[in-house]
A protein has these predicted regions:
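Short amphipathic alpha-helical segments and their helix-coil junctions
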Residues: 51, 55, 102-116
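Structured beta-strand/loop patches that form or line metal/cofactor-binding pockets in enzymes
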Residues: 85-101, 105-106
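Alpha-helical support elements that line or immediately flank enzyme active sites
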Residues: 127-139
Length: 183
């Protein structure tokens, strides 16, 4: 049986999710936590998909201007880790995205999935990394039963073009497909 990985404790407080990306990334770096997104499931044990999604919605809702939200997503994409080239394979590519986008699942023995993500375009990378973070450290059943309407709080209709919105829905379909797998 595999030994459960011990996680580093994070000096966490509720204000962290409303901090600027740079501030959160600095805290993560100071605590030697790498390859983690600002609202990360890797140090938020017990947070549900809905909790993490709501954290991102709160971050985006602090910005009145849609251009600020768009810029935040692109900055988030820039600061997010990249998927190693060896995983940029057709089987991990998300169909229906305007730019090449990869979503790589990492299944645990505890029936939990972690995701890593990348894209050739910054706005797509910001979205796919945010979704990867929201769904990481979740059970297959929680992922498979996620309701698409819960994304409404992200206000994608005003934020993204129809083509990019379709790409986000394709990303979610791929994520839910991994959650539905029986192997």
């Amino acid at each position: 049986m595999l030994k459960k990985e011990k996680r580093k404790k994070m000096p966490w407080n509720p204000e962290h999710y409303s901090m600027k990306t740079e501030e959160v990334m600095k805290i993560l770096e100071e605590n030697k936590i790498t390859n983690v997104h600002p609202v990360s499931s890797k140090f938020m044990d017990g947070w549900t998909i809905q909790d993490k999604l709501e954290s991102y919605i709160n971050i985006l809702n602090t910005m009145d201007d849609m251009m600020d939200r768009y810029t935040w997503l692109m900055d988030f994409g820039k600061k997010s880790a990249t998927v190693p080239e060896r995983f940029k394979l057709p089987e991990f590519e998300v169909p229906g995205c305007q730019s090449q986008t990869w979503l790589v699942p990492h299944f645990t023995y505890e029936d939990t999935i972690y995701f890593t993500a990348d894209s050739a375009a910054l706005i797509s990378k910001g979205m796919v990394c945010m979704l990867a973070d929201v769904f990481s450290n979740s059970t297959r059943s929680d992922i498979a039963t996620f309701e698409l309407k819960e994304l409404d709080g992200l206000n994608l209709d005003n934020l993204l073009t129809p083509g990019r919105r379709n790409g986000v829905y394709s990303m979610l379909k791929v994520i839910q497909g991994y959650g539905s797998r029986k192997d």
